[in-house]
Amino acid sequence: MSGRKFFVGGNWKMNGDKKSIEELANTLNSAKLNPDTEVVCGAPTIYLDYARSKLDPNIDVAAQNCYKVAKGAFTGEISPAMIKDCGVKWVILGHSERRHVFGESDELIGQKVAHALENGLGVIACIGEKLDEREAGITEKVVFAQTKFIADNVKDWSKVVLAYEPVWAIGTGKTASPQQAQEVHDKLRQWLKTNVSEAVANSVRIIYGGSVTGGTCKELASQKDLDGFLVGGASLKPEFIDIINAKA
């Protein structure tokens, strides 16, 4: 056993309303969830407070983004301090949709990671290659570069979960094979060992995201270096329970 606690995050993205969030919370609260798995639900900003009030205290909540400073003239942004004020402990940063739809740079994501950690939030930091990058054989080059910008901004790795999400597998129904996922996770751990420390490489959780379903989760979860999942669409459905219990 690695000693790393299995971690399952649900990223609701821009989905849901009060009615559906309450229904989902009731489903999760009444389900038998593996007590050895850490569970976090990423709610839309406007529903952070509501999700926190409806979910069982054993289920944490994450914001899906935050800005790199505490307050100021940044219309539409939210700060880690505001997130914490809602009773929320985590934030997802660097998701491929933030990178590719909203044009966030590696540098900006690194700055956001630093500020979130300084303010006591846990960070789910996302990395991953696009299809043309995988086909060009530069997967490692891309994910190592993204990881470096994150690593350069981390002082305390105990509050960081790395999420490897191959962009070509997000919302497409394509999933990296368990072997493909394990290969990248293993290479990431080696990179951390070389560039950060062996202790961090052994302790940091590296989770997988990209069309994870109730049907694919068990075999993925059996991979040595795969410490959990960041789940998109399936986190809005009852099958999220099967994914949480993939290690049960």
UniProtKB/Swiss-Prot annotation:
> What residues form the membrane-spanning segments?
none
Compartment(s) of residence: Cytoplasm
What EC designation does it have? 5.3.1.1, 4.2.3.3
Q: Does the keyword Hydrolase apply?
A: no
Q: Return the PROSITE patterns for the record.
A: TIM_1, TIM_2
The metabolic or biological pathway listed in the UniProt record of this protein is: Carbohydrate degradation; glycolysis; D-glyceraldehyde 3-phosphate from glycerone phosphate: step 1/1; Carbohydrate biosynthesis; gluconeogenesis
What is a single cellular component term in the Gene Ontology annotation? cytosol
> Which InterPro entries does the UniProt entry name for this protein?
Aldolase_TIM, TIM_sf, TrioseP_Isoase_bac/euk, Triosephosphate_isomerase, Triosephosphate_isomerase_AS
Binding of substrate, residues: 11, 13
What's the domain of life for this entry? Answer: Eukaryota
Q: Which GO terms describe its biological process?
A: gluconeogenesis; glyceraldehyde-3-phosphate biosynthetic process; glycerol catabolic process; glycolytic process; methylglyoxal biosynthetic process
Per UniProt, which keywords does this protein have?
Cytoplasm, Gluconeogenesis, Glycolysis, Isomerase, Lyase
Could you give a GO molecular-function term held by this entry?
Answer: protein homodimerization activity
Q: Which reaction does it catalyse?
A: dihydroxyacetone phosphate = methylglyoxal + phosphate; D-glyceraldehyde 3-phosphate = dihydroxyacetone phosphate
Function description:
Triosephosphate isomerase is an extremely efficient metabolic enzyme that catalyzes the interconversion between dihydroxyacetone phosphate (DHAP) and D-glyceraldehyde-3-phosphate (G3P) in glycolysis and gluconeogenesis.
Q: In which family does this protein belong, per the annotation?
A: Belongs to the triosephosphate isomerase family.
**HAMAP family in the cross-refs:** TIM_B
Describe its assembly. Homodimer.
Q: By what name is this protein known?
A: Triosephosphate isomerase B
